Amino acid sequence: MKKILLFIFSLLYITNCFAQETIQKKNRITDNVVEKFGVLKDNEEVKDGPYEAMYRRKVPVAMGNYTKGKKTGSWRFYDPGGKLMQIYDYDNHQLKYEAKEYTGTSDFYYTIDKEIADTDRITKPIKAGGRYYGYLPYLGMYKLPFNPYEYGTYGCVAVVELLISPLGRLASYKVRTVCNTLEYDQSITMNTKLFKEEDRQFIPATLNGEPIVSRILIRCQVKQDGGLEFIRE
């Protein structure tokens, strides 16, 4: 009996030695979304443990787990209304669920540079993270190139254009902004290397099972501070 107890205590001691201490952090992603996560105490750049992002402190828009800086297991993503948008398995890099998208109620459009026959089978490009949380980095990257408080942003709208390669890589990032009251219409292209590696990865569009080049267009409205947000947020 003593040997068994000694063995159990030894296992607990070894497990304790290998378990790394974490501390809890908060970070504001947007005006409305705050993320909560743990980081290693001896390296605060490495996320570890449960993760959640909350919309206006009430609605979870992302829930999952980090293991030593990597997303692991199945993550669930929601829109600001609490609707499940996507389930993505990061261990196997596999899409488990994607909510249906309807043209009349979506801020997203997709294009390909090919003629399509009635018999063709097409799949759209998909971003891990869903059609809300997954696209926050692309809206958050842009700011108006003029002082919004001096000129105002009333009537300003924007379209974010993401060019996705057949390998599922972000090949181009462009934003066109139109402010009718200011007679302003300008497109700005920015370096894709400004994004994190995971933000440059997509599931590519396919045509009859073959990966193809595609574009994702996101209609946005310009906020008072010159940033972007979804029209239907």
What residues fall within each predicted segment?
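Bacterial Sec-dependent N-terminal signal peptides
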Residues: 1-25
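Charge-biased low-complexity segments
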Residues: 23-233
